[in-house]
């Protein structure tokens, strides 16, 4: 049985994909839970129209994210922190701290969008990625200086 996916389904496909699945899987799982609908001729035409509309929306999102990325490329964030011996901080600089500083500079970036593997615990200059969109990942400079 062929179905059109409404949502991404692991190991099956992305929204708008037409996939072939067993009738039981479609009737008992995918369709009742709203993950897919039957691939009739009318639904195929509708999905073609929706794909073009979604593609236009996605292009707008990418353009907006790229505009923010261009502004972020010029931004640096500075933290003045108390330092112990060997340049180690008392505490650390986290994604929440960076997001708060960016918000103070007029950017609406959530802490989960900031790509920092572990909190910063030493003095220095760090390049930190910001995930604005799946295709747009600008980097900002984070300066950690002695207070």
From Swiss-Prot:
> What is the designated name of this protein?
Large ribosomal subunit protein bL9
Query: Gene encoding it?
Result: rplI
Instruction: Identify the domain of life.
Output: Bacteria
Q: Which GO terms describe its molecular function?
A: rRNA binding; structural constituent of ribosome
What are its GO cellular component terms?
ribonucleoprotein complex; ribosome
Against InterPro entries, the record matches this protein to: Ribosomal_bL9, Ribosomal_bL9/RNase_H1_N, Ribosomal_bL9_bac/chp, Ribosomal_bL9_C, Ribosomal_bL9_C_sf, Ribosomal_bL9_N, Ribosomal_bL9_N_sf
Q: Which organism is it from?
A: Gemmatimonas aurantiaca (strain DSM 14586 / JCM 11422 / NBRC 100505 / T-27)
The organism's lineage? Bacteria, Pseudomonadati, Gemmatimonadota, Gemmatimonadia, Gemmatimonadales
Q: Which Pfam families match?
A: Ribosomal_L9_C, Ribosomal_L9_N
Q: Which UniProt keywords apply?
A: Ribonucleoprotein, Ribosomal protein, RNA-binding, rRNA-binding
Q: Where are the transmembrane segments?
A: none
Cleaved signal peptide residues: none
Q: Report the PROSITE patterns cross-referenced here.
A: RIBOSOMAL_L9
> What Gene3D superfamilies does the record tag this protein with?
Ribosomal protein L9, C-terminal domain (3.10.430.100), Ribosomal protein L9, N-terminal domain (3.40.5.10)
- Role of this protein: Binds to the 23S rRNA.
**Entry-linked SUPFAM superfamilies:** L9 N-domain-like, Ribosomal protein L9 C-domain
Stated family: Belongs to the bacterial ribosomal protein bL9 family.
Any one biological process term the GO annotation gives: translation
């Amino acid at each position: 049985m062929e179905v059109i996916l409404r949502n991404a389904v692991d190991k099956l496909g992305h929204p708008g994909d037409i996939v072939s699945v067993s009738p039981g899987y479609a009737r008992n799982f995918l369709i009742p839970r709203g993950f897919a609908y039957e691939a009739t001729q009318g639904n195929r035409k509708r999905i073609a129209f929706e794909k073009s509309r979604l593609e236009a929306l996605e292009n707008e999102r990418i353009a907006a994210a790229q505009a923010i990325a261009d502004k972020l490329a010029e931004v640096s964030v500075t933290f003045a922190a108390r330092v112990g011996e060997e340049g180690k901080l008392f505490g650390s600089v986290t994604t929440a701290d960076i997001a708060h500083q960016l918000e103070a500079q007029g950017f609406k970036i959530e802490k989960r969008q900031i790509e920092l593997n572990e909190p910063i615990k030493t003095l220095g200059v760090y390049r930190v990625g910001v995930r604005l969109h799946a295709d747009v990942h600008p980097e900002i400079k984070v300066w950690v200086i002695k207070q």
